[in-house]
């Protein structure tokens, strides 16, 4: 029986290579990172990782791409993604670690930890007794996928009221997902923004979500609300956010993603004390966290097993929808 050609783009150690070979070696022939050749790309029926557009177009036998991250912007922007090629992502690997990032940074803002970090550098013992708590707050989560559900689940430990916003219409049986108290579609966004103490963006990047949190919507939020974005930078127009913050609106902002990355050195956001900035690391992939890395490989192996057995793959991306 002719073996299926599988190209693995990410760097993987000998242990992972052995796992693939032991589990699938009878049916697959693997080409690992660092050993790619023009012939291997052309022959590949399956690619695990993030191939470049020119590689996809060269892969004459390509049937399936398994991404090792969640975002698919790179492929939705392709002029002509090949018909007959299935794209799947690694949804399910990042929800836990991103939820910890979100909650940790909200607590940092509420307890004014950045000010204490600055005082530490100056050896200053200054007590600020004003502090906030997540307990009992109204939480609005934009996006009810793996990341949104994980954030909602952990927010419930603080006895919060958690509302979810889905991009698409909400079927009746989903209007109360177990992690959320309420779930609505985008038509309810304006009303829900006004109620929320904390707004968390984890929506995919699509034409419909681009610029969704514009100046008017940001300013409609409570003056002392906290805004977090761990989804896509296109959700929030940077200039609109800067304007709102300069006008003294919002208690603070946690930003891991931006319209332009890297964030330009000249951006006023860098100098705002109530803005916490990280360089798109809320959900670290390979080399960032061993548990996340294991979950990514488990997703890849489970889907490869499904592919070989003719079963439906998990995490199929709908390119026309952008996620």
Specify the residue positions occupied by each region the protein language model found:
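Glycine-rich NAD(P)-binding loop of Rossmann-like domains
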Residues: 116-150, 178
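Glycine-rich, N-terminal phosphate-binding loop of Rossmann-like dinucleotide-binding domains
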Residues: 51, 69, 203, 230-231, ...
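Rossmann-like adenosine-cofactor binding region
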Residues: 169-268
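N-terminal glycine-/charge-rich "phosphate-binding" loop or analogous flexible N-terminal tail
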Residues: 1-46
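Phosphate/diphosphate ligand-binding glycine-rich loop within oxidoreductases
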Residues: 42-120, 131-132
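Rossmann-like dinucleotide-binding domain for NAD(H)/NADP(H)
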Residues: 224, 230-323
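Oxidoreductase and adenylate-handling cofactor-binding alpha/beta cores
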Residues: 99-115, 157-160, 297-306
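Conserved beta-strand positions in the Rossmann-like core of class I SAM-dependent methyltransferases
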Residues: 163
């Amino acid at each position: 029986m002719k073996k299926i050609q599988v190209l693995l783009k990410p760097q993987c150690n000998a242990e992972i290579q052995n796992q693939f070979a032991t589990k699938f070696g009878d049916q697959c022939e693997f080409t690992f990172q660092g050993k790619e050749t023009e012939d291997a790309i052309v022959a590949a029926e399956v690619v695990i990782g993030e191939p470049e557009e020119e590689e996809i177009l060269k892969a004459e036998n390509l049937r399936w791409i398994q991404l090792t991250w969640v975002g698919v912007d790179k492929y939705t922007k392709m002029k002509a993604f090949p018909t007959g090629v299935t794209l799947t992502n690694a949804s399910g690997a990042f929800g836990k670690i991103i939820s910890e990032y979100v909650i940790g940074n909200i607590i940092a803002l509420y307890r004014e930890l950045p000010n204490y970090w600055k005082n530490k550098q100056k050896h200053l013992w200054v007590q600020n007794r004003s502090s906030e708590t997540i307990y009992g707050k109204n939480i609005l989560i934009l996006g009810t996928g793996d990341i949104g559900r994980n954030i909602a689940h952990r927010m419930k430990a603080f006895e919060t009221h958690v509302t979810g916003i889905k991009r698409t219409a909400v079927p009746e049986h989903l209007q109360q997902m177990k992690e959320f108290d309420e779930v609505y579609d985008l038509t309810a966004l304006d009303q829900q923004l006004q109620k929320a103490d904390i707004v968390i963006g984890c929506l995919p990047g699509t034409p419909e979500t681009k610029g969704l949190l514009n100046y008017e919507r940001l300013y409609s939020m409570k003056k002392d609300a906290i805004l977090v974005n761990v989804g896509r930078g296109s959700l929030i127009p940077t200039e609109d956010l800067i304007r709102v913050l300069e006008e003294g609106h919002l208690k603070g902002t946690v930003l891991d993603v931006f319209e332009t990355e890297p964030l330009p050195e000249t951006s006023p956001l860098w100098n705002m004390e109530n803005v916490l900035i990280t360089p798109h690391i809320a959900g670290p992939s390979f080399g960032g966290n061993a548990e996340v890395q294991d979950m990514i490989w488990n997703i890849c192996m489970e889907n490869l097993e499904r592919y070989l057995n003719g079963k439906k793959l998990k995490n199929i991306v709908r390119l026309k929808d952008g996620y």
